[in-house]
Structure formats: structure tokens, C-alpha cells
């Protein structure tokens, strides 16, 4: 029985069987061609293969030179069009990267925990002074200014009026000074306290005394000037006010008159030394 009758099957079309037969024949022919090509390649020598490789390299180099010359000979419009095309490609790539980064940020934000540490872009330079959340700044540690004495929040207050309103604070200052003096005079406390604590308390006591003495001296000077102006304006219809320089002279005269003899001698000696130094510096050999 022939091959054709062996492959006959009921319910199968003859055209499909013929197509299968042709495919089998073509596949056999391709296999024969491939085997013949392999035989031809195996029979080639190394010299002929080297010549073929050199010829291919020369042809590729010639083609590259030709393409370069043709690209240089193109008009500027084509270069501009190529630049626009490359710019459009770059912009499309950047837009794609932007949207991808946005998607990543949105996805990371959805998974972000409320106690996670804060993130910052590495593209921005880090400032020398950084605001660290949760860390107390030095500004908060400073005492808040009293708005009653802030000139930017209202009119300038008269210092004499402010002093008269808060004169009662002198009693509290004097009480603190007496308590601190008694504490430093206590021998039991001095034995228990360290040397550093004792020095700090002594400095605090000196500062409090100096502050209270300064306030009292200002009150005295203000009272002296008030009495002097009242005396010179006693019979005048228009009030006469002293200049700053005259006020200073009046205050110095009052202090000098109310000093003790020993204090007056010390003041005069300091003034003589001051004048002597000024005259000595004014000599010719001290000038450049």
C-alpha cells in the first residue's frame, strides 16, 4: 500500500493532508541544505576566514565614513529638527520619571507610619542651623520681655512715673539682701555648701546691692534737680529747665558738698591723676 493510502483517515480533508506532506518535504530539504552548508564551512581554511573578516571590517569602516560625511552635509534645519526631537524625547522621559516619582511618593505616603522619622530631599543643601522638632531652642529659654516697657507696643513711658509706681519693690529687694547676707554668715551652711556655691551667692549678693544702690542714687539725683529747679523758678512766671550739662554739674556739686572729708580727698586725688595723665599724653614726644 502506498504512503498516500496509509495516511488516509476518515473525516479528514484531502487538502490538509497534502499541506502536511508538502511541509514534511520542505523540512527535509532545509535539513539537507543546512548539512551541506556545515560541510562547506568545515572545509574552509583559516586564511580564507581571515580574508573574509578583513573585508567585512573594511566595508563597515567605509560605510561609517560615508554616513558621517552625509550627516555633516545635511542642512541646519535637519539638525534643529533632530534637536527638537531629542528635546521632546528628553521631556517625555523627564515627565515619565516625574510621574513615576510622584506615584512612588504617593505609595510611600500611604504606607507611612505616623511615628516614622521625617525625610528630606538630598538635592537641597543642609543649612548650618537646623530646626530640630522637639528640641528646645535657645530663644525659648530667654525670659520674655515685659510688654509694659516695650516702646514698640505703645508710647514711651516716663521713667519717673514708672519708678513711682514700682517703688514698693525696694522693700522686697532689701529683704532678699538681708536674707542672703544672713545665709552667708551662717557657719553651718558654709561648712555644707561647696566653694563654688558660696562664690555664686556672694556674686548674687553684690549684684543685688549694686542694683538697689543705683536705683536709689537715681532717685536722689532726680530729687536734687527737682529741688534746684523749684528754687530758681520760685519768683519766675515762666519755668526754667536746666540743660543736660548743667544738670550734671548741679548733681556733682551736691555730691561733693555731702561727702565726708576722707571721701572728698579720694575724689580730688583721682581727679588730679586723671588731669596729670591727660597733660602727659599731650606732650610732643607722645605724638606721632
UniProtKB/Swiss-Prot annotation:
Is rRNA processing included in the keywords of this UniProt record? yes
Q: Where is this region: Disordered?
A: 1-150
Query: Where are stretches of biased composition, namely Acidic residues?
Result: 86-101
Pfam families this protein is in? RRP36
Q: Compositional bias (Basic and acidic residues) spans?
A: 23-33, 50-85, 137-150
Q: GO cellular-component terms in the record?
A: 90S preribosome; nucleolus; small-subunit processome
Example of a GO biological process term:
maturation of SSU-rRNA from tricistronic rRNA transcript (SSU-rRNA, 5.8S rRNA, LSU-rRNA)
Coiled-coil residue windows: 184-219
Compartments, record wording: Nucleus, Nucleolus
Q: Which UniProt keywords apply?
A: Coiled coil, Nucleus, Ribonucleoprotein, Ribosome biogenesis, rRNA processing
Principal localization? nucleus
Biological role: Component of the 90S pre-ribosome involved in the maturation of rRNAs. Required for early cleavages of the pre-RNAs in the 40S ribosomal subunit maturation pathway.
Oligomer status and interactors:
Associates with 90S and pre-40S pre-ribosomal particles.
Per the similarity annotation, which family is this?
Belongs to the RRP36 family.
Q: What protein name is recorded for this chain?
A: rRNA biogenesis protein RRP36
